[in-house]
Amino acid sequence: VVHCAGINREIGDQTFDRVHVDGTRAVIEAARRTGVKRIVMLSFLRARPDCGSPYHETKWAAEELVRRSGIDHTILKAGMIYGPGDHMVDHVTRAVRTWPVFATVGYRERTVRPIPVEEAVNVLIAALEGRIPSPTVAVVGAEELELGAAVRRIAQVAGRRPVYLPVPVWAIRLLAQLTEWTMVVPLVAKAQAQMLAEGVSEPSPFAPELPEEIRPVLRFDVDRIHAALPDGRFGLSDLRIAQWWAGQRRHQAGRPSR
């Protein structure tokens, strides 16, 4: 069984604990009942305990449940996966189409190694087939680049040239909180702010690399970015209040007239 469930923000009763920890516990129990021989879990590259981020900590707790399950397993600690509908190319593209200024995280550049979704799927298949000997491995893309360079590359493919403004990490965390409160899908979630502040290129704690023949080889190039570009930009429909108002109007329209 492949276990990829996860959230990057909490919504109502969909908390990090319920989705990451309780959800993983349920997968393990179901695997035992049905005689599943292998669990492949997709985790996060820097999931770890005691780091101050509920996302990272609950992902780590889920990893530990799998490790202690007694079932043969492979834990894939993956970095930033991109493709249509992602939270990287999608959100950056819509942001640079909407605003003339783009905020970059911190005054010291962090790095990222983006993984195209098709290569992430290939790694999942290899893990299911037992071709990855280590029980825990790091999964990162072939190309390492600074986050600012990745953003500029996306903006270039999207045909935009915004002004880039470095802002302190605390400001990105504040932006994340505000957009979680106000947007249906936030521009950046608090968990993602932590990821951007740290960079997404090195595993923490250490995990070995994939076998050479399974490692991603595709660069973060124009063709792959273009394939992941979304339509449109951010608008009023992305706001929670607009969604609420539309729901109220539908409700009123459905009521019988007197």
Regions from the language model: what does each represent?
Residues 127-189, 202-258:
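Mid/C-terminal beta-alpha module of Rossmann-like enzyme folds, strongest
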Residues 10, 45-57, 81-86:
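Conserved catalytic-site region of short-chain dehydrogenase/reductase
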Residues 26, 87-88, 107-129, 135-138:
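Substrate-positioning beta->alpha
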Residues 23-26, 38, 61-62, 116-119:
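Conserved cofactor-binding/catalytic machinery of classical short-chain dehydrogenase/reductase
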Residues 17-21, 40, 59:
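Short alpha-helix in the Rossmann-fold core of NAD(P)-dependent oxidoreductases
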Residues 1-26, 30-33, 45-49:
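NAD(P)H-binding glycine-rich loop region in Rossmannoid oxidoreductase-like domains
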Residues 64-85, 91, 98:
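Conserved beta-loop-beta element that borders a ligand/cofactor-binding pocket
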